[in-house]
């Protein structure tokens, strides 16, 4: 009698639908690309070269980065973006920009659909200009495009924050040796108030952005301040094309996630909104009974699209 095959987790199913490619840009620099049909996503890492950046060095730039992202929407190949800032229990902070492109031009655009080799080449050619713009708004921080291995390691740690230090040590001494199939969690447990993934448990919230807001009215400094017992905090701003704004990218909403080491730590994670203003707390909604899909939408992979994962209802209502 053959053993039963365990059913795929939602994370395994979502990531299995994405192909991880390796390409070089116009300067011969390796670039990792996540491909899903005609959609391609590039990740750009923002770090402090000294490794000691405090959270405010990133949160203070959110407005500038948001304006830069909105301008990228004028390129008719760009379909969406995400901007994630995260902090770890040890106080380290970093940011990831996810940019998604499509081989299908927007309706009315004077372009033809591109095949994969053409699309990959076009993205690689445009990356230099894109990176220059981001570097101009990130003075003092290191900006670089993620390789395929960077993406693997990033996703592996996102699902198990407890191994973050081990992954950093391995990367500094020859590499982790992980592959794309190692990235998804092997275990998931979903409840109304939390989502368990490998050895971590997360709680997520969403907030929609109104048409007259540059950014959601969230105090990002207090949301992301490192806290004992909270392995990782992440706030991900999601951007989508807004035809009413002359096809620029516009803030669509934010997903906030706190990771702890087990179910006993969930009350600690759930206290995250307590330092926000009353009006902000009223708009920041717990992802009740949708913790797994909301966690995925908040990863720095620009996954919050209807064909990738179930878009949290709070955000879908503003689309």
Where in the sequence are the language-model features?
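Extended, folded cores of ATP/NTP-driven motor/assembly subunits in large transport
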Residues: 1-319
